A protein has these predicted regions:
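Hydrophobic alpha-helical segments
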Residues: 1-114
Length: 114
């Protein structure tokens, strides 16, 4: 599935949109396209950021972040969302910090054997 949604580039963002881009910025300093699709209605980005952080980055979550990214990756596989899978498993791989282990985990997910 693909969609074409007008996105306001970061370089053109002002006011509330600029503020939301700053809030949605990743630790690497980028704003993911999944957030940028909200650029015409910044208040919807606010809700997306809040949901994302409550699921993956809330201080009360005791599961390791790498595991949460693996769960998000498996959810992406089940939803046939290559975009989300690419980003979540990239994060998981970085957090796992062992490419062979990450490859085994990915293979298990891809074969529906998590």
């Amino acid at each position: 599935m693909s969609a074409w949604i007008k996105m306001i580039p970061e370089s053109e963002a002002t006011g509330p949109l600029r503020e939301m881009y700053d809030q949605a910025r990743t630790p690497h300093g980028t704003v993911d396209n999944v957030m940028k699709v909200h650029s015409l209605r910044p208040h919807t980005m606010q809700g997306h950021v809040a949901l994302y952080r409550s699921v993956l980055h809330h201080p009360d979550i005791t599961l390791p972040v790498w595991f949460l990214e693996v769960v998000a990756s498996y959810t992406s596989i089940k939803n046939n969302c290559d975009y989300s899978l690419t980003h979540h498993f990239h994060n998981a791989r970085q957090l796992i910090a062992d490419n062979e282990r990450a490859d085994r985990i990915y293979a298990a997910l891809a074969n529906s054997c998590p």
